[in-house]
UniProtKB/Swiss-Prot annotation:
Pfam families: UreD. This is Urease accessory protein UreD. InterPro entries: UreD. PANTHER family: UREASE ACCESSORY PROTEIN D (PTHR33643:SF1). It is found in: Cytoplasm. Keywords: Chaperone, Cytoplasm, Nickel insertion. One of its GO terms (cellular component) is cytoplasm. One of its GO terms (molecular function) is nickel cation binding. It comes from Haloquadratum walsbyi (strain DSM 16790 / HBSQ001). Required for maturation of urease via the functional incorporation of the urease nickel metallocenter.
Length: 304
């Protein structure tokens, strides 16, 4: 099974088939369509975390870093994309390495809007590496799929046993126009996490509405928007985090659930709703509660 880069998950067979379809405009991996962001953050002694190195290729852009987080040692990196949309043949690859004891929050400027496609697909890839004692958050804005869009979204986490990695995502179908719900072609999102090469989580959302309507009881039922939060923290009190998050989500508009990972490696949260604002609020509430348990301070929700 082929891959798009050295770090990515194997490309699913359906997306390999899409990749054989020729594009009339710039080909996949062409100029402006092969975005790369390779970031390394580090920290010395008790000083704040700094961005040690960065390599970016269009359409990724970075103006600088922020130190507005209530956690003094944590750095915030907000990636920008001047193109405003994801189109057929786009391949975007993000790699973040957090050196020992570094604290970082990675996000982006706005939602990833995946446009209508006639061939190929778009791949949004993230590889997160957290070394000993590191704390790394990756919470991008929602991914929005338009009519006939195809999107493969993969996240790989590699971490030390005493590190923490938090990953969040929200998926919104057909948010750019007045199309029928779930008129996109194919959406496949997968998150894998490993602690010293030991797999602790493998989770996927694979939706092909033309083959199977997602609005069934076994998938998402009556809802349309899907949100996920993954908290990988083998050294934490996982049961306590799960209980606090569960209580926080009791009044969520829609449906939400919390599960603990095997070997107490962390928790997963899934939220469903009819509006992106409701699902985003649920994921942010779970993130906020997790932070209070792990860092003793809540999330900077007003700054997002």
């Amino acid at each position: 099974m082929s891959t798009d880069s050295d770090h990515t998950h194997p490309i699913p067979p359906a997306f390999q088939e899409y990749d054989t379809q020729k594009l009339r405009q710039s080909p996949a991996f062409g100029h402006g369509k092969h975005g790369i962001a390779d970031l390394v953050v580090g920290r010395e002694d008790n000083k704040p975390t700094r961005l040690l190195s960065d390599f970016l290729r269009v359409p990724y852009h970075l103006s600088g870093t922020l130190d507005s987080d209530p956690v003094d040692e944590l750095i915030t990196v907000c990636l920008q994309d001047p193109t405003g949309a994801i189109t057929q043949g786009d391949r975007h690859s993000l790699t973040v390495t957090a050196r020992p004891d570094a604290y970082a929050h990675i996000t982006n400027q706005s939602a990833s809007k995946v446009q209508t496609m006639k061939a190929s697909y778009a791949h949004l890839e993230a590889t997160l590496i957290a070394e000993s004692g590191a704390y790394l958050e990756y919470l991008p804005e929602p991914t929005i799929l338009n009519e006939d869009a195809r999107c493969l979204q993969t996240t790989t986490v590699e971490m030390a046993p005493d590190a923490t990695v938090i990953v969040g995502d929200v998926f919104v179908p057909d948010g750019l126009s007045a199309h029928e719900p779930f008129s996109f072609d194919h959406y496949h999102s997968r998150t894998d996490a490993r602690v010293e090469q030991r797999l602790i989580c493998a989770d996927a959302v694979n939706l092909q509405p033309a083959q199977r309507d997602p609005r069934n009881l076994a998938t998402i039922g009556e809802y349309t928007v899907i949100g996920n939060l993954y908290v990988f923290s083998p050294g934490a009190d996982v049961e306590a985090i799960a209980e606090m998050v569960h209580q926080r989500l009791t009044d969520h508009e829609g449906a939400a659930g919390v599960s603990t990972l095997r070997n107490e490696a962390g928790i997963t949260v899934r939220a469903l709703g009819d509006r992106s604002t409701d699902v985003t609020a649920a994921i942010e509430a779970a993130w906020d509660e997790t932070r209070r348990e792990l860092l003793g301070v809540g999330a900077p929700l007003g700054d997002r």
